[in-house]
A protein has these predicted regions:
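Long hydrophobic alpha-helical segments that form multi-pass transmembrane helix bundles
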Residues: 166-245
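N-terminal signal-anchor module of multipass membrane proteins
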Residues: 2-90, 94-97
Length: 413
């Protein structure tokens, strides 16, 4: 379908502009995504704060069966799966905002300015989070890429998909060529050892001052790193934007074929790269190729999981849109998803206290299974906070501040 370049969402000329009900799947996906991010970050980064060895997958302690099982599970469903969900949902959010501005009659330059302010503020929040709490922040990169996406809101869908596909293909071809070259030079075993170094020992944490110093170092390095990250993140964000523009998640029954295709491709990519990557991490597959491919090709699992959720909960969305209450088991996840920024930053506060060598300094020598439980426990705390805020009818404090700084006291007009 071709679109008017200035229209974020195609609407029949004879129909009034509808006010769509709030979608449950994006919030549900955000809530689940935060669990994946918590578990992945504990293994790859937070354990370094306690003085432990970092790893992309976690370590096997005393030949533990549970550690091995955890590594096999997380390489397929956790590591390099949370951030692509985040990327897709952030692009989806840009699409929803663009549609809202169009319905309000904003001219294109003004709409771009509103989106640029919103994601510029997200980048500032990310920079502060990176320096003062966690150098592994992702909001800075997403905010800066969001600024670029503000320029693309009027681009035709076909062009956006072409851009996304081309960037994704180039990224994977370069990654594959690079890893094959490294494997030829280093050998599979040495390459896997290099990959499993995770965040490495470059960012030692001995005091809170070292947290600040490391954050500043990474922030300065982001000047060069974020353009490279954009090759991996932007295709997923563009896909999310198109999903919003086309109303795919808003009407899953109409778009069932697209959702099924996305879910199928995503699951094949996640398992097809994640399972071999797990075998590599356990030393059962003497290569390092899949440890890279799971972070490039395997990211298709992110939008795939979102599509799967849309298919599974299509009936629930229809009933909620008709006025039915959200089912009780889904409410905590949705409450957290609506407050994802607060939940994400709160994770950092919790894990800094738990892992920081200048604080509790726990779990430095923990295996993959125990770190999975620790990450889950930290996520559960954020879930409880979100439920309490929902019960009180309060937004997340960071969401409220972000909205105020982005749109002003009166909000969007």
């Amino acid at each position: 379908m071709e679109h008017q370049p200035h229209r974020p969402i195609p609407l029949p000329a004879s129909s009034p502009v509808p006010r769509a009900p709030r979608l449950i799947v994006p919030d549900l996906a955000r809530g689940l995504m935060l669990w994946g991010i918590a578990v992945a970050n504990v293994t790859t980064a937070w354990v370094v704060f306690a003085g432990g060895p970092a790893s992309l997958t976690g370590w096997v302690v005393d030949d533990s069966f549970w550690d091995k099982l955890t590594i096999m599970f997380t390489t397929s469903f956790v590591h390099a799966r949370g951030f692509p969900m985040f990327s897709t949902l952030l692009g989806f959010g840009v699409g929803l905002i663009a549609a809202s501005l169009y319905r309000r009659g904003y001219p294109l330059p003004k709409a771009r300015g509103v989106i640029a302010r919103r994601y510029g503020m997200l980048a500032i929040f990310g920079a502060l989070h990176m320096v003062f709490l966690f150098w592994g922040d992702i909001m800075l990169a997403y905010g800066l890429i969001g600024l670029f996406m503000a320029c693309l809101i009027a681009v035709r869908t076909r062009v956006l998909l072409w851009m996304a596909g081309s960037l994704f293909a180039v990224t994977n071809l370069v990654a594959l060529a690079g890893v094959l070259l490294l494997e030829a030079v280093l050998g599979g075993g040495q390459l896997q050892e290099l990959l499993n170094g995770g965040s490495g020992d470059l960012l030692q944490v001995t005091s809170y001052w070292s947290v600040l110093l490391n954050g500043l170092i990474v922030l300065l390095g982001s000047i060069f790193g974020i353009p490279l990250q954009a090759f991996m993140l932007l295709p997923l964000m563009l896909l999310g934007f198109v999903l919003a523009r086309e109303g795919v998640l808003a009407d899953p029954a109409r778009h069932r074929r697209v959702l099924a295709w996305l879910a199928g491709v995503g699951l094949v990519a996640a398992l097809g790269t994640g399972v071999p990557a797990g075998l590599e991490a356990l030393g059962l597959l003497p290569t390092g190729v899949f440890g890279v491919l799971t972070m490039t090709l395997g990211v298709l699992g992110g939008p795939g999981f979102i599509a799967l959720l849309a298919l599974v909960f299509a009936g629930v969305q229809e009933r909620v849109a008709a006025g039915a209450p959200v089912p009780a088991p889904l409410r905590p996840l949705i409450a957290l998803g609506k407050r994802s920024m607060t939940g994400y930053v709160l994770q950092s506060v919790i894990f800094l206290a738990v892992f920081g060598s200048f604080a509790l300094g726990l779990f430095a020598d923990a295996g993959a299974a125990l770190l999975l439980l620790v990450g889950t426990a930290g996520w559960l705390v954020t879930l409880l906070v979100a439920v309490a805020l929902e019960a009180a009818g309060k937004p997340g404090p960071l969401e409220a501040l972000h909205r105020r700084l982005s749109y002003g006291k009166g909000g969007l007009i």
